Amino acid sequence: MKKKLTSIAIILSILVFSGVLKAEVKLPAIFGDHMVLQQKTDAAIWGKAAPNKSVKVTCSWDKKSYSTKSDKEGNWKLKVKTPSAGGPFKITISDGKAITLNNVLIGEVWVCSGQSNMQMTMSGYRNQPVLGSNKAILSSTNKSISLFTVKREKSLEPLDDFSGEWQQCNPENVANFSAAAYYFGRMIQESLGVPVGLINSSWGGTRIEPWISENGFKNFDWVKLPDKKQEGEFSPQTPTVLFNAMIGPMVGYAIRGGLWYQGESNRNEPSQYEKLMPGLIENWRSEWGTGDFSFYYCQIAPFDYGTGGVNSAFLREAQLKASTSIPGIGMACLMDVGEKTNIHPADKEAAGVRLAYLALAKTYGKKGFEYSGPVLKEMTIEGSMVKLTFDHAKYGLTTFGKELVNFKIAGENKRFYPAKAIITREGISLSSLQVEKPVTVRYAFENFVVGELFNTEGFPASSFRTDDWEIK
């Protein structure tokens, strides 16, 4: 009898102990030590607990506690009020058994996504370096920057979580973090003097469609959505599958904005991309449900794609047009850093810094500096002469000593000829002996060129055209 009672006691102890383990709060990967929460907002925190269990969250910055109850499946979610930038703080979460998140910072959070040019780390790719990265890595230790890289994953169904962890900003971690994102974050942190959290969720070679949720395709009927019940392997190019696995699990995490560097894999469909780019932004904003957060992206850099396919200048044009299609967005131009035989420009600092200029001006309201390259304002034709004026050229235009060689003009016969281009006080004057009656202008409208037109602040002009002739 005594033996039987002892056995029952052991079984009960095991049941009680396992019940405690089961009751322990579980958090998604996005919540952890060294994380950054968006400042001055109602920041969502969520996770798993035992079903119908009370969960309490206590924040060290104001000692305030927030409570909620998990549903019948153990899911819970609440919001905490975050103060102005600061830290480090602690967050304690308990459903009877407490866990503590340490070194929590309050500041500015940005999600960074795209294909290989966003994925490219500070260490670069094999035989493809990042310019000046070794020195930047050496001096990268900064307690006010935290880094999170989402592990690559794809899914036909929305997932609740992904793999990754918040890391402190030091040489070992920066070497393996997105270069464009790091240079952006470093400049934001230095300029604002607040903590910055960077979440990199990118996958090389991918199109834009995988990064949009199913709800985002309602207006894009040319995109075929996948069968969620299909068996076997599927491509990371499949619409929705990267949003489901690499963006969706963090939807709701409070952020200031998004960064995007992608487009090379969509270069043959510029007309569709012009719609899909703002479509992705509106989709993410809708999924987050926190208003029109800022979103800035890089225009693809010039590269020699060869003779097949559509001239990638049309994709750059689509990106330029998209940049004014909806509020709260902007485009960083990279016309001066492209490499003829390398689709991954080494100058990733240019990408990150130009994105940061956009954010500092348009999101944070900083004044007294330029944040964009020259943008065509008006074209006038006087006989055989074409005159162009530009916005974002307050102090004029320059080539920094180079010759203007990338302008072409055409008449009604649609034959383009190199134009003699002269920078004037008002803008640029163009002419060609082969074109007596010009009707249109194109600048740097090729797969690969090295852009030579800048404003005096050093920002390059995008390739552009003034015609709407057939894309080919």
Region annotations inferred by a language model:
Residues 9-18:
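Bacterial N-terminal signal peptides
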Residues 19-23:
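Sec/Tat signal peptide C-region and signal peptidase I cleavage site
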Residues 1-9:
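Bacterial N-terminal signal peptides that target proteins for export
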